[in-house]
Amino acid sequence: MPTFKVLENRQLSEHTFCLKTERPSDTIVAGQCFNVGVPGSGVNREYSMYSDANAPHLEFLIRQVEGGTVSPALAAVEPGDPVEVDGPYGEFTLKTPDDSSLNYLFICTGTGIAPFHSFAATYPDIRYQILHGVRRDDEQYDAAHYPAGAYTSVLSQGAKPQCVTDYLKSHTVDPDTIVYLCGNRSMIIDVFAILRDAGVPGDNLFTEVFL
């Protein structure tokens, strides 16, 4: 697997970090993913790109899993270290990003916001809203990067616990909205059903499951 140099390893919360590396010369489309690992470990994991697809580097939003085979090793790398990066792969991409008539709703949980951060950075002129389900305030990763009003988070821990399904049940979604879902499987199943019941056609729904 090709190796690239680590440029930065930025801690975002207690368990989540942003890994910045050199990028391959391949054409990359926002929403695609890469297999990433530590050389010599024999294991890697698929991560969605977090950065602008046109940037001179790659960024990955990674949650460190206790006892995991890949994320703890990546959490320990430092600038100058090599990491294995293979890709890009995947088709979880915007089909017509130049169509200014479209409204997008990006719904995600945890680090599932990664492809949507990439969409927003790569296509700054699209009209979008992000609905981000997190546990705590410190998991609102780089929320200040989005235009005012474009980012909404719901916290499952705290004084008034809420999840994205609760939010959607109390807010109307225009059936013409193009909706992308990224996160855990149960969230995607539940949200898909809510949106279909609200009249959003299946052709307007795109999903990516984060394991």
Segments and roles (model prediction):
Residues 2-81, 86:
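Ferredoxin-reductase
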